[in-house]
Curated annotation (Swiss-Prot):
Belongs to the glyceraldehyde-3-phosphate dehydrogenase family. It is found in: Plastid, Chloroplast. D-glyceraldehyde 3-phosphate binds at S238, C239, T240, T269, R284, T297, G298, R320. One of its GO terms (cellular component) is chloroplast. The record marks H266 as: Activates thiol group during catalysis. Disulfide bonds: none annotated. This is Glyceraldehyde-3-phosphate dehydrogenase B, chloroplastic.
Amino acid sequence: MATHAALASTRIPTNTRFPSKTSHSFPSQCASKRLEVGEFSGLKSTSCISYVHSARDSSFYDVVAAQLTSKANGSTAVKGVTVAKLKVAINGFGRIGRNFLRCWHGRKDSPLEVIVVNDSGGVKNASHLLKYDSMLGTFKAEVKILNNETITVDGKPIKVVSSRDPLKLPWAELGIDIVIEGTGVFVDGPGAGKHIQAGAKKVIITAPAKGADIPTYVIGVNEQDYGHEVADIISNASCTTNCLAPFAKVLDEEFGIVKGTMTTTHSYTGDQRLLDASHRDLRRARAAALNIVPTSTGAAKAVSLVLPQLKGKLNGIALRVPTPNVSVVDLVVNVAKKGISAEDVNAAFRKAAEGPLKGILDVCDVPLVSVDFRCSDVSTTIDSSLTMVMGDDMVKVVAWYDNEWGYSQRVVDLAHLVANKWPGTPKVGSGDPLEDFCETNPADEECKVYE
C-alpha cells in the first residue's frame, strides 16, 4: 500500500507552502477583514473555512488535497461548506444594533442570517438610519423598504417589528435561534429571559449583564470557556471591558498585575442628555456636547468576570467627553516583576498581537488621535509611544478602541462562536488544514509535526 508520503507527492504540488500554526491565530470561530489567511486557502479575509464532521474518516492528505485543488489548478477561491444558517433577531436597532448588522453583512460566509429587527421607529426609521449614518457614512449595501413591515438589504428581506415587551415578539413564529439584545434594558436574567419565553433559543446581551447567573465572554480572553450547554443567556461585556481585558491579560501573564486603576476617556453616548435635563446620574444630566462628564464604569471590575485572577485588583472611572465615537483607556498598574522597561511591555504586546491576540489587539507606533481609530476592527490598540514604566514596578498603558464598530465586531464574533458550538453544526475550521485535521485525529502520525 502506498505510504502517506507517496500519496502526498501525487496530490499536493511541491511548491505549495503550508502556513505555520501561528500564521493566523485569530480565534477559530470567526474571521475579521484584517485576518491574514494562508496562501493556499484562496479565501477572502472575511471568510471562515468549514470542515465537516464526515471528513474525520479521511486521511490528512485527502483533507488538504480537497482544500488545495482549486487553488493549485488556478481556479476560483475555495468555498466553505454550505450549512443551514441560524436565524438571528436584533432587539433594539440603535447604535450597536445597526453597527452589528453592518458588521454581520460584511462577513460573507457568516453562519448567521439576520431575519428580523425590533425597532420602535418602524420600517421608515430602520431603513433610513441603517442607510445613512453620521459616524459610518452611507451604507454601501442597497437598503429598501419592501412593505410596511419589511426592509431589504442587498435584496435580503429583514422583517421589522415594533414592541417594547419581549414577551410579545414573534420569536417562536419566526424560529429565532439567537437574539442580539441591544436595548441596554433587558440585561438581567428575568429581562433577557423574556426572549427565551417568547421562543428564542439563545440571547447575547450587548452590555454588562446584571446577575451572577449570566456568564460573560470577551473574545480573545475567555471565549474558550463557552459551550452550548453552559447558558442560554450570555453577555459580551462592555466596549471598555473588551478593550481592557485583552491587554490586561497580557500584562498579568507577562509581568503579574498586583493592583491598578483605569480611566476611560469615553465618547458620549445616548444615555447622556443633549441639553441639561433630568437623569438619575446628576452628572450625566448635564449637556453631553458641552462638558467633560465624570461618571462611573464597571469595566475594570468586570475584567474579573473573564480573568478571575484579577478579582479585587482593578477599579476605575469614566470621563465622558464631547466626541461622538472612539474612546481611550488609561491603565496604571503595579506589577510583580521588577526591573522592566517600556520596551519590555510593548514587546509583550507586539508578541500577543502577532500571536494569540491577532485580530483582537494591535500596537500603534504612529502618533494618532481619536478620529484615526474610527471603524477599527480590533478590540484594543496599544499606543506604544505612551507606554511608561515608573520606578521598578509601576506600568502605564494607553489603548484606543472604537466603542461602537470594534465592539460590534466582537458581538458578531461571539454570535459566530455560539453558532459554531450549536449541536449538529459543522465546525468552522481554523484556516489551517493540518490544525483542523489533528484536532479530530490527534493520534495520526502526521500530527506529530506539532510535538
